[in-house]
Amino acid sequence: MRTFVLVGIMLLAAAPGAPVRAQTNPFLGRWDITATTAKETYPLWLEVREENGQLVGFFQERTGSVRKLPEIAREGSELVFSTGAPARQGAPKPVHRAHIEKGKLVGTLTRGEVTVPWVGVRPPTWKSANASAAHTFGPEIVLFNGKDLSGWTLQFPNQPGGWVVTDGVLTNEKAGNNIISTQRFKDFSLSMEYKLEKDSNSGLYLRGRYELQVLDDAGKPPALGGHMAVYGRVVPSVNASKPAGEWQTAEITLVGNRVTVVLNGQKVHDNVAIDGITGGALDSDEGAPGPIMIQGDHSKIWVRHLVVKPIK
């Protein structure tokens, strides 16, 4: 994922002098959103909080990282918010309007004359879990066989793949496509050996929804966009990266929305909670099994070992 830039944004009041009552506000909490256009569906994510009597919102667009909303308010039976200035100068400002319908958050994104409908549902009620605990595993599943791309598909089938296997190592010779495992997983442990080129930027998506950043940043302080960060959401406790060109090992366990990561023998995440999807997620159906996805549309990565052990 592109290097994370944390931007502080001033919150606009929900309504001057009119505090929002939590007990009468059905918008509060988290929402897993699916937007639908004529050509595709794509995931979004929203969290609405009440702080000091005013609404505060956090939004995950289809790419990038979760950000605080600059504008959010309740207007009668509707929730209205904007993600801020348009992506390019002169473009119309994006505005979201939503209402509650049979327990769902039903909304639209409007940019000038373009309107995109979307529907949000509540995320799963995650059971108490400890990704760092001892687990009982099923048989190992070798996702990379060292020979070819059996068991993998392209995220964008109509675009060049760019992935090849040479001397038992999987690599993306040309940036441009992500690869997705054909198998889906619920709770699991994953073991991967990989290396990066200088300044390389890639990512590993768990269940296709939660990105662990893969970045050449050895020697730098841990960051929201640093190596093995839950991209834009959780900073690693330590940067355990090796320099570019050296083989690295990652041992990752995902149980519910809890993740533990050991990078090069050092624990960098210890049963941390993932609040929601990250940018680039395949969907927002957090309760469903999902694939492993390796990002190949940014920079070069080499992978020589990739094994998943499902948790019973």
Protein language model features and the residues they cover:
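Sec/Tat signal peptide C-region and signal peptidase I cleavage site
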Residues: 17-22
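Carbohydrate-interacting regions of secretory-pathway proteins
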Residues: 25-312
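Bacterial N-terminal signal peptides
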Residues: 5-15
